[in-house]
């Protein structure tokens, strides 16, 4: 009976596909490590996201995706020290807990081993596939007073790694938090616009250099709001690069431009190129 209980406990704390720790196990371990670190060195958490994993699943199939996840797990085991905890947090997200680090510089060789291992060639069923990862790193107590802050700051570092070239590791710095908060505010504002406001094009005439006549218009994004202010493109600049918000904003603007052009033409007005 005791063996059965231990087996069930192991199953509850591990990821069935890779055999790594699962999210619950990892979070509990981080909480314990930060609470008991004392003067025994720094604690670090690494959050890893596989680049282009969805594309691999879509083009090579889920069998290839599962094989890649298992390979990543093995490569992480080979790159890390005995006692380091590796977890699969879900999907293509992995995490590593490092303890007893003498200083921040001790991270560098570990990160180099991880990236070297993960970026090595990988193939499935004779088909070469790219295996690269973006990594966000945060140190305790330097980057957070508790495990909640540590996870948040590692996640922010990961966000910047993914949005600045991918395939790299970034250590959290305070300025990353400021940048993340600004970008998050832009995305939140864009979501509000799509749900509650009516963005509309403002038209700027294009003038012919030959005769000074109007040959068309440029449609400029503007969004008047109830308080009388106007949301400008720079206020939501990050949203235009977002994979979901960018196309949604573009579609909303294109619909308005098409409606305006149709109305002008119905009145016999020459629109030109917009």
Task: Say what each PLM segment does.
Residues 7-12, 16, 21-42, 73-81, ...:
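Short regulatory alpha-helical coupling segments
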Residues 8, 26, 30-33, 94, ...:
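Hydrophobic scaffolding residues in well-structured cytosolic catalytic/regulatory domains
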Residues 9-28, 48-62, 67-70, 201:
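Conserved nucleotide-binding and Mg2+-coordinating catalytic segments in signaling enzymes
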Residues 13, 31, 35, 73-104, ...:
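Conserved helix-loop-beta segment at the catalytic/binding core of cyclic-nucleotide signaling proteins
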Residues 15-18, 46-49, 91, 154, ...:
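Conserved metal-coordinating catalytic motifs of nucleotidyl cyclase and c-di-GMP turnover enzymes
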Residues 27-60, 87, 216:
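Active-site-proximal structural segments of metal-dependent nucleotidyl cyclase/transferase enzymes
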Residues 29, 182-240, 263-266, 270-274:
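Active-site core of bacterial EAL-family cyclic-dinucleotide phosphodiesterase domains
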Residues 86, 113, 117, 123, ...:
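Cyclic nucleotide signaling catalytic output domains
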């Amino acid at each position: 009976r005791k063996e059965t209980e231990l087996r069930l406990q192991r199953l509850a704390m591990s990821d069935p596909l890779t055999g790594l720790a699962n999210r619950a196990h990892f979070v509990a371990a981080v909480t314990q490590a930060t609470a008991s670190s004392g003067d025994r060195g720094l604690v670090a958490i690494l959050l890893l996201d596989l680049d282009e994993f969805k594309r691999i699943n879509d083009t090579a199939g889920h069998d290839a995706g599962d094989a890649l996840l298992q390979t990543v797990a093995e490569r992480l085991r080979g790159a890390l020290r005995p006692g380091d905890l590796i977890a699969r947090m879900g999907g293509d997200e992995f995490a590593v807990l490092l303890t007893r680090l003498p200083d921040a510089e001790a991270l560098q060789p570990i990160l180099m081993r991880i990236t070297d291992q993960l970026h090595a060639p990988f193939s499935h069923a004779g088909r070469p596939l790219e295996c690269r990862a973006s990594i966000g790193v945060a140190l305790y107590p330097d980057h957070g007073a508790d495990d909640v802050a540590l996870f948040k700051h590692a996640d922010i570092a990961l966000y910047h790694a993914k949005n600045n070239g991918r395939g790299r590791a970034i250590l959290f710095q305070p300025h990353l938090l400021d940048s993340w908060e600004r970008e998050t505010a832009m995305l939140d504002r864009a979501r509000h616009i799509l749900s509650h406001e009516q963005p509309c094009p403002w038209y700027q005439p294009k003038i012919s250099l030959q005769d000074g006549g109007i040959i068309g218009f440029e449609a400029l994004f503007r969004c008047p709001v109830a308080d009388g202010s106007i949301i400008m493109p720079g206020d939501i600049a990050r949203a235009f690069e977002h994979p979901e918000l960018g196309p949604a904003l573009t579609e909303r603007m294109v619909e308005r431009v098409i409606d305006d052009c149709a109305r002008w033409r119905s009145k016999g007005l020459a629109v030109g190129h917009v």
